[in-house]
Each structure stands twice: as structure tokens, then as C-alpha cells.
Regions:
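Short acidic, glycine/serine/threonine-rich loops at helix termini
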Residues: 32-37, 66-69, 89-93, 114-120, ...
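Active-site cofactor/cluster-binding pocket
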Residues: 2-3, 303-307, 319, 323-334, ...
Length: 591
């Protein structure tokens, strides 16, 4: 197994299944393009033994145009983008879909700038292209992002319909997790070689000329447009077959629509994206309380198969909440809600369902707004109400239009072996240090490790909070650590600015980087911090990381010192092993 972030997992598959990669980096998809460029520069090869050609264009519009041109020559091509970059590609996406040209665009889904720009994640960009004719496949985790990257490349070649493979920006693209990698032999064995040959045979060639991109008149345009229906009708089966083939090769099973929960559920949430893992955890907890609940995971969003959605939804369901991670001002409701509602209403009208469940729709997670177990519990509580809100928001307090749901106070019991928080200053190395910690734990122990990093849009100087989990089982928790076993404050100036001690579990470890000794530091702490540390019976430690860094010739970079202190205090790795692994990690970084 490997410890990697979502972008790295996707880029690895895209690189190995492509021949031409046109890029123009945009947050949060940038590292996919950057890694592909670096790999090509270092001579890494795809599964056919060739080095893909990576070219950076002047904009995202140029990148998708270069992809279009490469595809017309019979090459296998891909690109990566987000947000406004995706919007610039819309005209070419229409052309690619209309010409039934197979390719995959990997999207780290991000907020589209409206009243303000935001670099953070939601589905407002991918929802703006749902009408282009591209198929849309959504991954919910780092493991799924890797696997669905390959499934997309297989399904697009089988169906000839271009695919948008998307996953939540930052929450999945930048989350580090431990996954099972796809080997070259597995990828090579699953790719459809006959369809690749057919794609090459369709290349524009003066030896056997064809005409494309014509201007059509009213006498033929409509008929030609409808003639693509059979290709779209077959997409679901191609995706399902690709998922089945992947399951045979790897043992990991997926379905385009997958239900999780009580077989006779009465309340069900329909959702797609990273929030699925959070919903699954809440469902597991509610099932132990005897509640009949479930979550329906939407993976293949376009083409939307009403038939298979309804097959996955339990017949016993009485109320359904459909969640969208986007806002469409002026619309009757958000996109996924409208699709689900239409599917249910048509089935009821045609006599395929005896009853029509009550369906409500909600918005959540815009611009990476936190969506935790308390939000999921609030939604299930709303579904139990006699008259639930038909439209709602969750995760915020809406005192303007009063659409928000009151959040539940009870939270889920933690199943992690260790949960930790690290507070640092942008560019002080805290985030990089935590990434090293996660990879060291993931790669040198049998445990699963997860890391997520919260920071603002500034390049340097802002607060960074790194969230680390270690568990015996795969980690589905796509939300922030609320209560930690270990809290590290890497900057003394934060001690009276942020509520860090409040985030500590009873009996947890609080580590403070300070120039003051253990004898004098307590008197310098704010009384509120002293009170919280006493109340929680915290184990309080101090380290003069700046002094140690200077003595070791590290200048102001305290991150390595804080890393070693973390391993020493938590004993998640024995001291000698931690030191050796840390030295190896640093040697790789600085080669």
C-alpha cells in the first residue's frame, strides 16, 4: 500500500494511460499537472513504454484545444482543471461530446467565483457543464479517485462519450490517505485494446479523408443530434462493466449507484462526493441505535440512469433528503434534487412505484464549508419531522431566509487509534512536516493514516491547521478532527489567539513551542488556557524548537524538530524507528 493524496493518485493513472497531456495549472488541480510535467521531464513512461508528451498552454482554453487536436490525430490525451478553468473549456467540451471523441478530463471540483473568488471546493464548476454531453463520474475518496480515474479511461474508450472524472477539491484532492495502488500490469490488462485501436483508426488522415466539424442546416441537424442516443444509453453498462472488471482484478467493488444502510430503511440521504464517508459513519452509528436509515451514493451522475437509481433505493423508504454541493440561484431546486425527484415522480406516474416518498433538498459544503457528523444527524432528524423543510441548508446559520437546520449536539465516538492537530504559520513548514508524519506512519506501519490541511488563500503568514488520524481500519472520516489526543502549537503567538486547548481530549498531550523553560512557561500562559489544561488533565510539554533548529543548522525551520517531538511524545512509532524514518524522508525531499 502507499500513502498519497488524491491529486497524486489520479495523476499517476492519467499519466500512465495517456500519450499527450495538455496542462494549465489551476488550484486545486495544479499538482496533477505539475506532477505529470515532472514525470515526463524525468523520463517516466506510460503503460505502453512511451514517455507522454506534456505541454503547458497559455490558458485552460488552450489546454482543451490542444487535447482536442491530439485526439483528432488518434492520440490518447487528457488534462486537469478546476473552477473557472473548466468554464473556459465548455465550448470544446460540446464539440468533443458531439463528435463522440473519447477522452477523460480530471477535475478537482472547486467553487466558481460569484460575489467573491474562492479557491476551495464544491460542485459549482462541474454542475455548470452537466449539459455539455460529457459523462460525469464522481469519486468520494482518495482510493476511489485513483480507481475511478482508470474506470473513466476504460469507459470513455468503450462508449466513445467523453468523461469528466471529478472529486472534491481539497477535501479529496489534497487529503493524504493510505490506498492500494494500481500496478502497470493491472492497468494494461484492463484497458480495452480493441477500442484503442478503433480510436486510432478514426484519426484524421489524408490517406482516408473524412469530414468533421461541418455546418448543418435545419434539414439534418435535429436528426443527427438524436442519432447519438444509443451511445449515451450504453454508458451506464460500460461503466458498470468497467467497475466489475476492476473488482475482478483488485477485489474492490463499486457500483454507479450504491446503497449503504438498513435494507428496509425509512429515511435515506442521496449524495455524491467526499461527504459519503461521513454519511456512512453516521448511518453505522444510527443502525446500532435501531434506526432504519441509509445513504444512496451517486457515482455516475451523467448520463443519469433513473432506472438504476430506483433499483438501488429501498422500496420501504418514506422520506428522502437529496444533498447538493452547489447553489443555482433562481432555480426551483438544485440539480441532483431535480434529477432524483423527476426519477421518482415518473416512476410513480407510470405505475412502477406504488408510493411516492417525501423528498426534500438541501445545500451543504459550499466553498469547503465543514460538513461533519452533526450535519448528517441534523438531516436525519429533519427527515423524522412531521413537516420537514422542503428546501434547507446545513452547516451554516441562516438568519436571513431561515433555511438552515439546527445542528445536532451529539457527535460520533472516535474509532481512531490517534487523532492529532498541529497549529502552524503559513510557510513555517508545519504542513510539510505533518505530511511527512502521515507518510512515515502509513508506509512504515500496518496502520491507516489520513491527513488534511486547513489554511487560507494567502501564500504565507496565515494560520495553518493540520489534521492527522491514525486507525486500524480504512479511514472514511471526511471531516475535521474535533477532539484530539495530541495538539501541537508551533507558534507561541497563537496561544492567546486561538482556542487550541479546547480541542484536546481529556488526558491528551499539549505540546508548545516556546523559548521559555518548563519552570517559567506556565506563569506566562493566559489564565483561560491554564484553566482548560487543568480541567482536561492535559499532559503539557514544551520545546524550544527554534533553539534546537539553530544549533542543528536548520535556521528558522522548526518543522523537523516538532516532528520528532510528536513521535517521541505519542510513541506512535518507537523513537529509533521514528528517527530513522524521518531521516529517510528528509533525504528524499532534499535529493
Amino acid at each position: 500500500m502507499i500513502t498519497i493524496d488524491g491529486n497524486g493518485a489520479v495523476a499517476s493513472v492519467a499519466f500512465r494511460t495517456s500519450e499527450v497531456i495538455a496542462i494549465y495549472p489551476i488550484t486545486p488541480s495544479s499538482t496533477m499537472a505539475e506532477q505529470a510535467d515532472a514525470w515526463a521531464g524525468n523520463g517516466l513512461k506510460n503503460v505502453w513504454g512511451d514517455v507522454p508528451r506534456v505541454v503547458e498552454m497559455q490558458s485552460e482554453a488552450g489546454a482543451i484545444a490542444a487535447v482536442h487536436g491530439a485526439l483528432q490525430t488518434g492520440a490518447l490525451s487528457t488534462s486537469f482543471t478546476s473552477s473557472q478553468g473548466l468554464l473556459l473549456m465548455i465550448p470544446t467540451l460540446y464539440k468533443l461530446a458531439g463528435q463522440l471523441t473519447p477522452f477523460v478530463l480530471h477535475v478537482a471540483a472547486r467553487t466558481v467565483a460569484t460575489h467573491a473568488l474562492s479557491i476551495f471546493g464544491d460542485h459549482s464548476d462541474v454542475m455548470a457543464i452537466r449539459q455539455t454531453g460529457c459523462a460525469m463520474l464522481c469519486a468520494a475518496s482518495v482510493q476511489e479517485a485513483q480507481d475511478f480515474a482508470l474506470i473513466s479511461h476504460i469507459a470513455t474508450l468503450k462508449s466513445r462519450v467523453p468523461f469528466i472524472h471529478f472529486f472534491d477539491g481539497f477535501r479529496t484532492s489534497h487529503e493524504i490517505n493510505k490506498i492500494v495502488p494500481l500496478a502497470d500490469d493491472t492497468i494494461r490488462g484492463l484497458l480495452p485494446h480493441e477500442e484503442i485501436a478503433a480510436h486510432r483508426a478514426r484519426a484524421l488522415n489524408p490517406e482516408h479523408p473524412v469530414i468533421r466539424g461541418t455546418s448543418a442546416n435545419p434539414d439534418t441537424y435535429f436528426q443527427s443530434r438524436e442519432a447519438t442516443n444509443p451511445w449515451y444509453n450504453a454508458v451506464y453498462d460500460h461503466v458498470e462493466q468497467a467497475m466489475n472488471d476492476l473488482a475482478d482484478a483488485t477485489g474492490r467493488h463499486y457500483k454507479p449507484f450504491e446503497y449503504y444502510g438498513h435494507p428496509q430503511a425509512e429515511r435515506v440521504i442521496v449524495i455524491m462526493g467526499s461527504a459519503i464517508g461521513t454519511c456512512e459513519e453516521v448511518v453505522d452509528e444510527l443502525l446500532t441505535r435501531g434506526e432504519k436509515v441509509g445513504v444512496l451514493k451517486v457515482r455516475l451522475y451523467r448520463p443519469f440512469s433513473a432506472q438504476h437509481l430506483l433499483q438501488a433505493l429501498p422500496d420501504s423508504v418514506l422520506s428522502v433528503a437529496v444533498l447538493d454541493r452547489t447553489k443555482e440561484p433562481g432555480a426551483l431546486a438544485e440539480p441532483l434534487y431535480l434529477d432524483v425527484m423527476t426519477a421518482l415522480a415518473e416512476a410513480f406516474n407510470q405505475g412502477e412505484r406504488e408510493t411516492l416518498p417525501r423528498v426534500i433538498g438541501g445545500r451543504y459544503g459550499l466553498s469547503s464549508k465543514e460538513f461533519g457528523p452533526d450535519c448528517v444527524l441534523a438531516i436525519f432528524n429533519e427527515l423524522s419531522a412531521a413537516k420537514p423543510k422542503p428546501r434547507f441548508t446545513v452547516g451554516i446559520y441562516d438568519d436571513v431566509t431561515n433555511l438552515s437546520l439546527p445542528l445536532a449536539e451529539n457527535t460520533l465516538p472516535s474509532t481512531a487509534r490517534l487523532e492529532a492537530l498541529f497549529y502552524g504559520l503559513g510557510s513555517d513548514g508545519s504542513v510539510s512536516a505533518t505530511k511527512n508524519n502521515i507518510k512515515i506512519i502509513g508506509n512504515s506501519t500496518p496502520w491507516f493514516a489520513q491527513g488534511y490541511f486547513v489554511y487560507d488563500s494567502k501564500k504565507a503568514g496565515g494560520l495553518t491547521v493540520s489534521h492527522l488520524r491514525v486507525s486500524d481500519k480504512p479511514i472514511r472520516s471526511a471531516y475535521l478532527v474535533a477532539q484530539a489526543d495530541f495538539v501541537g502549537c508551533h507558534q507561541l503567538q497563537f496561544i492567546d489567539k486561538y482556542q487550541m486547548a479546547e480541542r484536546l481530549k481529556p488526558g491528551g498531550i499539549f505540546l508548545l513551542n516556546t523559548p521559555y523553560s518548563a519552570d517559567e512557561v506556565w506563569a506566562r500562559l493566559p489564565q483561560e488556557v491554564q484553566a482548560v489544561l487543568n480541567q482536561k488533565q492535559a499532559r503539557f510539554y514544551v520545546v524550544n524548537a527554534a533553539k534546537i533548529a539553530r544549533e542543528c543548522g536548520l535556521a528558522a525551520r522548526i518543522n523537523t524538530v516538532m516532528q520528532m517531538a510528536f513521535f517521541h511524545l505519542t510513541q506512535i512509532l518507537p523513537g529509533d524507528s521514528a528517527l530513522m524514518e524521518l531521516q529517510n524522508a528528509l533525504s528524499l525531499i532534499h535529493i
